[in-house]
A protein has these predicted regions:
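Conserved beta-strand positions in the central sheet of alpha/beta enzyme cores
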Residues: 40, 65, 87, 107, ...
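Catalytic cores of alpha/beta
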Residues: 71-81, 114-122, 139, 159-175
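Mobile acidic interaction elements
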Residues: 29, 34, 121, 128-129, ...
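Conserved N-terminal beta1-alpha1 strand-loop-helix module at the mouth
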Residues: 1-81, 101, 150, 161, ...
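Glycine-rich phosphate-binding active-site loops on the catalytic face of alpha/beta enzymes
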Residues: 89-95, 128-138, 172-194
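Histidine/lysine/aspartate-rich catalytic loop segments that bind and position anionic ligands
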Residues: 92-126, 130-135
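Glycine-rich beta-to-alpha transition loops that act as phosphate-gripper elements at the mouths
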Residues: 17-19, 66-72, 88-92, 108-113, ...
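CoA-thioester-processing core
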Residues: 99, 106, 137-148, 155
Length: 207
């Protein structure tokens, strides 16, 4: 199964913010126990690179990627640490070009036709749509998908257990991203059983 197939199969790509490296593996295992075996560890905190390494080395069943990547240096470091895919909040010609050149799956943030056309130039077929609830949600993605046949979206922002099925049922959605299945407060408190249940609930709601 390819990385893109794994992301679609997981349905949810948790956006994980970690303050401590030692929380990485328990978080990954808790989500995997809930049926979510992918995770996007964001580069919003200093421990992100080592957290990615920890998951890559200790949780082979989990597909770990790096999020909030805004330059090539971060992308290179993330991949060196074991990230299997890259997610960026916006479109960076340099980041996308480096990922394509190195055969690393990448989902750049694109919310306008111009950004999507720049992404398509690199042969990509999936974009991050962020923040989805600000830029028009499903209706916006539906309209954007009309001229860009075959394009898939990874929406993040405003997706939750209450509306995940509506998103996943749309033919132009590849998977959804979000942090609601792995709240930062629950990670910090070690509420692993709660995180497992949140993942189970989200997957059940998507069916």
């Amino acid at each position: 199964m390819t990385v893109m197939e794994r992301l679609a199969n997981s349905i949810i790509v948790p956006v994980v913010v970690l303050d401590k490296v030692e929380d990485a593996v328990p978080t990954a295992k808790a989500m995997a126990a809930g049926g979510v075996d992918t995770m996007e560890i964001t580069f919003r905190t200093a421990c992100a690179p080592e957290a990615i390494r920890a998951v890559a080395e200790n949780c082979p069943e989990v597909l770990v990627g790096a999020g909030t990547i805004i330059n090539v240096e971060q992308a290179r470091l993330a991949v060196e640490m074991g990230a299997k895919f890259i997610v960026s909040p916006g479109f960076s010609e340099e980041v996308v070009g480096w990922c394509v050149e190195n055969n690393i799956p990448v989902a750049p943030g694109c919310v306008t036709p111009t950004e999507i056309m720049a992404e398509l130039k690199h042969g990509l077929k999936m974009v991050k749509f962020f923040p989805a609830n600000v830029y028009g949600g499903l209706n916006a993605m539906k309209n954007l998908s009309a001229p860009f046949v075959g394009l898939k979206f990874l929406p993040t922002g405003g997706v939750n257990t209450g509306n995940i099925k509506e998103y996943i049922d749309a033919p132009f959605i590849h998977a959804v991203g979000g942090s609601w299945v792995c709240p930062k407060a629950d990670i910090a408190a070690g509420n692993w059983e709660k995180i497992t249940q949140l993942c189970k609930d989200a997957r059940a709601a998507a069916k």
